[in-house]
Amino acid sequence: MEVVIVPDAADAAALVADTIGALLEREPEPVLGLATGSSPLAVYDELAARYERGEVSFANARAFMLDEYVGLPADHPERYRTVIEREFAGRVDFAPGAVQGPDGTAEDVAAACAAYEQAITASGGVDLQILGIGTDGHIAFNEPGSSLASRTRIKTLTEQTRRDNARFFGGDVDAVPTHCLTQGLATIMAAKHIVLLASGRGKAEAIHHLVEGAVSAMWPATILQHHPHVSVLVDPAAASRLQLADYYRQTYAAKPDWQGL
């Protein structure tokens, strides 16, 4: 696991966009994993800006979303498929149908989850997965207590997550769905490269557990310690509880530019 402490979200976005740009050039049919929430927004803005300048193209790429609310109507503005289209996919040149997500409207939830797992496998797997992290250490909607071997499934959201997400629903916690479909921790771990973004002091405890704590289902993100290629990009506030912060700064400063993330 590599920890990169950056001045702010813009610096993190530039690093991630560089990495994705290199992937788009290197792979004939690259597969991205897309997260929602506030953490990746600066990355999506940077990628859209580079697309507008003709620096990157997603025409040959595919993408898979991490999760989706259950029960929101298809036209709801906070349905994650709508959010991804608005914040990123609709601003670049993905081919029609190239961006897929779990079907939160499916009547047969188990079948929908199995089909989504199969679609990811059939694509050849995710080359680069973007992640955020919850204040309680959840990634995607794998809440504390989630099985470290879990696959795509339906989950009940914790009250903490619903409170955290209420800002997207006009501050109304009751408007936040109680259930979701989410990629499991084992599904996420199958990605070849994972890039996790976090900013703000509110994420400091979760980042401390992720990087320096014991692997535990109570802090689901800690499973990433077992992945061979994880990049954790954090601002100074999110890094404020890291005991080895100076070491992480030193090792990244000494890293050759050609190596990238």
From Swiss-Prot:
Alphabetical keyword list: Carbohydrate metabolism, Hydrolase
Pathway the protein acts in: Amino-sugar metabolism; N-acetylneuraminate degradation; D-fructose 6-phosphate from N-acetylneuraminate: step 5/5
Catalytic activity: alpha-D-glucosamine 6-phosphate + H2O = beta-D-fructose 6-phosphate + NH4(+)
Annotated active site: D67, D136, H138, E143
Pfam family membership, one: Glucosamine_iso
Position of the signal peptide: none
GO terms, biological process: carbohydrate metabolic process; glucosamine catabolic process; N-acetylglucosamine catabolic process; N-acetylneuraminate catabolic process
Gene3D superfamilies noted in UniProt: 3.40.50.1360
PROSITE patterns according to UniProt: GLC_GALNAC_ISOMERASE
EC nos: 3.5.99.6
GO cellular component terms, A-Z: cytoplasm
InterPro entries, alphabetized: Glc/Gal-6P_isomerase, Glucosamine6P_isomerase, Glucosamine6P_isomerase_CS, NagB/RpiA_transferase-like
Single annotated GO MF: glucosamine-6-phosphate deaminase activity
UniProt similarity note: Belongs to the glucosamine/galactosamine-6-phosphate isomerase family. NagB subfamily.
Protein function: Catalyzes the reversible isomerization-deamination of glucosamine 6-phosphate (GlcN6P) to form fructose 6-phosphate (Fru6P) and ammonium ion.
HAMAP family: GlcN6P_deamin
PANTHER family in the cross-refs: GLUCOSAMINE-6-PHOSPHATE ISOMERASE (PTHR11280:SF5)
Record-given protein name: Glucosamine-6-phosphate deaminase
Annotated organism of origin: Beutenbergia cavernae (strain ATCC BAA-8 / DSM 12333 / CCUG 43141 / JCM 11478 / NBRC 16432 / NCIMB 13614 / HKI 0122)
